[in-house]
Amino acid sequence: MATIKPFKAIRPNKYIVDKVAALPYDVMNSKEARRIAEGNPYSFLHIDKSEIDLDENIDLYDEKVYLKARENLDEFRKQEILVKDDKECIYIYKQIMDGRAQVGIVACISVDESLNGTIKKHEYTRPEKEIDRTKHIKYCDANTGTILVTYKHQRMIDDIINDFMDNNEPLYIS
């Protein structure tokens, strides 16, 4: 079984979460990201696709892109657009699309368990994209994206999650 661990998240300020929330970086190109983030200085795309704040002809893998991501992340934190939790947590995430709810958790997983096969890959990622995201993590000193990991149904996990959701208010409703 894979190991998960809590962490101190850097999360959107609850008063502007709708302005910060953005689609994953890999479902749009730079031009689309520029259009989506236009007029919204709070969009997380300024961090995840920071090339939108640079010359449109810049090489996506230029060091300036990673430096801009870090600069934007630091500015978001300074302005409290993003705030860091005081204690480590495992976060419950519920998403409703087309009337169907999906519930999961957000936690840290082991890179070693991913490499040794304990956690199985569910998709092929092009090497240049892996290098890009590795650099992004290194420059930002933060993992700004999530990786979907599924597990075989375990009633005990469902019970823990459901009990928590039944007895606590959500941080965000969007």
Predicted region positions:
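A cross-family signal for N-terminal binding/gating loops and helix N-caps
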Residues: 1-174
